[in-house]
């Protein structure tokens, strides 16, 4: 099945909506949702009078909602009212994430009363729109978990909105900052070799449409994750292979075929991303049958994949590892890489050196969207929380940070994120990502080096 293009994911998500409502609800690739545009319009005068821009603009600049040129254009206006009007003119053109980022910036600059005003207006607007067909809920921008049963999902309120901590506009707007020659020269000797062109092969396996007795629901927003990762890995210099909607047996067979590709011999690393429903230790095929993750890792270990021996192998798993929704807890007030320890040595047999041996599994790092026993959260419009955070951090920090440290930053973003869906079990829900590693050196991706 061909991957949906980044420019068509929005149309794909909304094709089942009622015809009378279609014009208002379909998103442009880099356009603001009509609900959000109308919310800003209805509060335009109050915002123009009350916005405090000095710190707010810096937050929006940091989130890539505005550019340096836009900030200068705004500040060139005479008077705070005119400056506020200029910002309000720009915001609707700054992508589907601009509204959420604006609300977050209001909160961060102690203008939460304006955020509350916007969210109240937004909730009222959504009540006015015609209800969706009972068979489809593809337009609802609320968080759902990766193991949420279909009957439960259909009961969710149509006026739910999720705050996003992601600051990008999606795959079309992703840009990876290049590594500088100076950084490469000071770090490459202690890191894994990553110089090949391409850097390696990457596989993105995305299951979205499910059949079988399990009655697993359509992974709305899964196509966004798919497009995001394909774009990200290409920008990082990988040759990307795509698989969509595979049964458990097909996943096993095609992962094995991928692991045995001759190109691994002449490239320096490998990436495997698995996006599906799941349980602890396994992911679902579209037929409702499970593929054990240990079987996946085994396909790429030193015994079964000699072409990748001593080369870093990255795995990213976007799937539930249980069905418990993390409700979170209230926060209380307050707030080397080691060398080998050596091995036992015998005085006998010094004449003949033994062949170097490797542990069966090494040089792997695996990022999980959630902890054991818990559900992974996915926004039905913007995709999974984890993939959003992964794309944000890797695009911004691959230039000067190794993969393990980047995954720590991903953890921090996920930790701070909170579901916003009043009236549902997902309101104020939490998620915590994690990673495990058998890497033996720092893994820098060195994007853009050496220059072509």
Swiss-Prot record:
Spell out the PROSITE patterns in the cross-references: CARD (PS50209), CASPASE_CYS (PS01122), CASPASE_HIS (PS01121), CASPASE_P10 (PS50207), CASPASE_P20 (PS50208)
Residue ranges the record assigns to the propeptide: 2-169, 326-333
Q: What UniProt keywords apply to this chain's record, in alphabetical order?
A: Acetylation, Apoptosis, Disease variant, Hydrolase, Intellectual disability, Lissencephaly, Phosphoprotein, Protease, Thiol protease, Zymogen
Q: Where is this region: Disordered?
A: 327-354
Which Enzyme Commission number(s) are listed? 3.4.22.55
Q: Where is the composition biased (Basic and acidic residues)?
A: 327-336
Sequence positions bearing N-acetylalanine:
2
Q: Which SUPFAM superfamilies match?
A: Caspase-like, DEATH domain
Q: Where is the active site?
A: 277, 320
Named from the GO MF annotations, one term is: cysteine-type endopeptidase activity
> Where is the PTM Phosphoserine found along the chain?
157, 340
What are the recorded Gene Ontology BP terms?
apoptotic process; apoptotic signaling pathway; cellular response to mechanical stimulus; DNA damage response; DNA damage response, signal transduction by p53 class mediator; ectopic germ cell programmed cell death; execution phase of apoptosis; extrinsic apoptotic signaling pathway in absence of ligand
One Pfam family here: Peptidase_C14
Mutating residue 102 to A has which effect?
Answer: Loss of interaction with CRADD
In which domain of life is the source organism classified? Eukaryota
Residues in domain CARD? Answer: 32-121
State the family it belongs to.
Belongs to the peptidase C14A family.
Q: How does it assemble?
A: Heterotetramer that consists of two anti-parallel arranged heterodimers, each one formed by a p18 subunit and a p12 subunit. Forms a complex named the PIDDosome with PIDD1 and CRADD. Interacts with NOL3 (via CARD domain); inhibits CASP2 activity in a phosphorylation-dependent manner.
Task performed by this protein: Is a regulator of the cascade of caspases responsible for apoptosis execution. Might function by either activating some proteins required for cell death or inactivating proteins necessary for cell survival. Associates with PIDD1 and CRADD to form the PIDDosome, a complex that activates CASP2 and triggers apoptosis in response to genotoxic stress.
Note on domains (UniProt): The CARD domain mediates a direct interaction with CRADD.
Name of protein? Caspase-2
Q: Which organism is it from?
A: Homo sapiens (Human)
Q: Which gene encodes it?
A: CASP2
């Amino acid at each position: 099945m061909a991957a949906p293009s980044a420019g068509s994911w929005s149309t794909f998500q909304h094709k089942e909506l009622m015809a009378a409502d279609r014009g208002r609800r379909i998103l442009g690739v880099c356009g603001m949702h009509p609900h959000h545009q109308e919310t800003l319009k209805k509060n335009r005068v109050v915002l123009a009078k009350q916005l405090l821009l000095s710190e707010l603009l810096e937050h929006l600049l940091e989130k890539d909602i505005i550019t340096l040129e836009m900030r200068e254009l705004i500040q060139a206006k005479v008077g705070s009212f005119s400056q506020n009007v200029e910002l309000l003119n720009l915001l609707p053109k700054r992508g589907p994430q601009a509204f959420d980022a604006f609300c977050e910036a209001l909160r961060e600059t102690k203008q939460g009363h304006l955020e509350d005003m916007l969210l109240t207006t937004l909730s009222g607007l959504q009540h006015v729109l015609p209800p969706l067909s009972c068979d489809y809920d593809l337009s609802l921008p609320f968080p759902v978990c990766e193991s949420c049963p279909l009957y439960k999902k259909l009961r969710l309120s149509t006026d739910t909105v999720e705050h996003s901590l992601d600051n990008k506009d999606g795959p079309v707007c992703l840009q990876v900052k290049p590594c500088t020659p100076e950084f490469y020269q000071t770090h490459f000797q202690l890191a894994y070799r990553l110089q090949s062109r391409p850097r390696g092969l990457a596989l993105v396996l995305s299951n979205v449409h499910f059949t079988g007795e399990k009655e697993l629901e359509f992974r709305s927003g899964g196509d966004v994750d798919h497009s995001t990762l394909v774009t990200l890995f290409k920008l990082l210099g990988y040759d990307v292979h795509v698989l969509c909607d595979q049964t458990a047996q097909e996943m096993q067979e095609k992962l094995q075929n991928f692991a045995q590709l001759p190109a691994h011999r002449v490239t320096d690393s490998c990436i495997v991303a698995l996006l599906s429903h799941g349980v602890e230790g396994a992911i679902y095929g579209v037929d409702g049958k499970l593929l054990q993750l240990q079987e996946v890792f085994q396909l790429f270990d030193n015994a079964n994949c000699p072409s990748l021996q001593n080369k870093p192998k990255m795995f990213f798993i976007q799937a539930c590892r249980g069905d418990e929704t993390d409700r979170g807890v209230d926060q209380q007030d307050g707030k080397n890489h080691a060398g080998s320890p050596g091995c036992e040595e015998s005085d006998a047999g010094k004449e003949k050196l033994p062949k170097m041996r490797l542990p069966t599994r090494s040089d792997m790092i695996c990022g999980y969207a959630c902890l054991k026993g818990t559900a992974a959260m996915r926004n039905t419009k913007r995709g999974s929380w984890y993939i959003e955070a992964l794309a944000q951090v890797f695009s911004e920090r691959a230039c000067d940070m190794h993969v393990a440290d980047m995954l720590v930053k991903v953890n921090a973003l996920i930790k701070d994120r909170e579901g916003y869906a009043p009236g549902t079990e997902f309101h104020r829900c939490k998620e915590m990502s994690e990673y495990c590693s058998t890497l033996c050196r720092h893994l820098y991706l060195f994007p853009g080096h050496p220059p072509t």
